[in-house]
Amino acid sequence: MIARSSPRSLMQGWIFGALVALVPNLTSALETKLSAPGASESLVERLEETSSVLTAETRGLDTSLEILSAALSDYRTIVQIMYDEGYFGPVVSIKLDGQEAAEIDALSAPSTFKRADITVDTGPRYRFGKAIVQPLAPDTVLPEDFAPGKRATTGAIQQAASAGVQGWRDAGHAKADVADQEVIARHAQARLDATIDLAPGPQLTFGKMIIQGDTTVQHSSIRKIAGFPSGEVYSPQKVQKVGTRLRRTGTFGVVSITERETPNPDGTLDFDATFEDLPPRRITFGAEIASRDGVDLTATWTHRNVFRRAERLRFEAALRNIGGAEDIDGRIGLRLDQPDRLGPDDSTFWSALLERRNTENYNVSVASLGYGARRTFSDQLYAEASAGFQWSDADDAYGDRRKFRYFIIPFRSEWDQRDSKVSATSGYYLDAQIMPFAGLSDTDSGIRFFFDGRGYTSLGSGGSIVLAGRVQLGSVYGPPADSVTPDFLFFSGGAGTVRGQPFESLGIPVGTGVAGGRSFLGLSGEVRGKVTNSLSLVGFYDYGAVDLTSVVGSGSREHSGAGIGVRYDLGGFGPLRFDLAVPVQGDTGDGLQFYLGIGQAF
């Protein structure tokens, strides 16, 4: 049944609303029944979940007038659902105590209703006869479901209209819209003829970006970061890219790029850019516990827009080995990102680091200072390069108070295609680093390589079972191991490499000590299975090998570990992680190890 609005029906609706509000006619539990012969199980479920009458109790509809109001609204609701499913000739009957709801006068409605019966005669399923969208922009692809002979649905019509409009917008016609739409149901043939006429409008070019909103960022910096394409042909993708560049700075809580309603007489289209700044400062904390290495604490302090040019100043600090087997060590780092110094997808940065590392095999103090540039290719891919100096003073297996002075040129590229950074179920992550280092003050020169690749795949629906794998490769090419600072060399063991083995326990024997290798290979595999939405169990195996040469070979030293773990999901923070691991291979093992932290192991 399809109802048309009229002044009389509107007046009846007003009176009806007043009566619903004023008359406390409470009804006893309403007995309901839905009959839809020939309808699929999924369609019946949709009707049951959507009908106001069938869900009256859960909606809190108590009075007879509320039940009647729900029944009247259900006519339109059910017909629309039938149209969505391709039934364009349905007959809907809703009876309250045996009387058709549409025929009940609200002013003389009974005080209670005891029973509601909904009967839906679906009729035949319709198919498209005509399915036309005109005119179309070049290369526009309409939905496959909108074609002659295909099952007719209102959803297919709406999607076809949207695709046609979007095709013109992609071609630069920013104000393209639907001009007219003709839909004819031919009941005798169970056929639906749909014709959609589009109004492309003129092709427009980008005009000006007009900055609005409450922001303390200099407008000149906003424009440089945005790279607004004034003078270029309109493109929705370019608008989206402008917003992405601005959000990427981490300065703004809200970025809205909205086109003006009316184009300019010269064929350009201006845009309003509205901003709201995030709070200027942000503090984070982290902790990780390992049985042998004690507690590691980390903290960061970030100041956004520190010089009103959308810069981000970040301090980080760490304390390690608290209560562990080695002396407490830590680090203090600083990085200043400057997004408005180069082009819209490029930024510059300053970095500085002071670090002390105390391990079983070496102690080293490091200071570094660098300046670099970063190119962002997409939300998933970036590369950066910098130049700077590093000073290292080390005590290791090769001697005490050894000094290393370098001019370094680190390159790094990261490609992140994971579906989640904190608990991935599919995709991959690649991190490649190359760092040439030129020795100063009689220090040897060389190149350091490092690669970290991770992959994820789901076996069950909704990520119920996830297989995760990781490969790490490292190499130092050029100088011998005894002529390189120990923090450039490679060890294996502990969280991040081989769980079940003590931290950095595997290296190259040198006299009575152990030094790092010039090459490293790490392999890790995990099977993650959900027990509940929040709780997961994990089984894992890790393998590590180091070698004195620049490539891990048959003569390398190796070890491995395996174990089980529990993950408890903390939402956007990632899971709370607890792992138990034991040595499997090698002579560096020290019994059962446990690890507690936030986030997946990789």
Q: Model-predicted segments: where are they?
A:
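Outer-membrane beta-barrel architecture
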Residues: 272-274, 300-302, 335-337, 368-372, ...
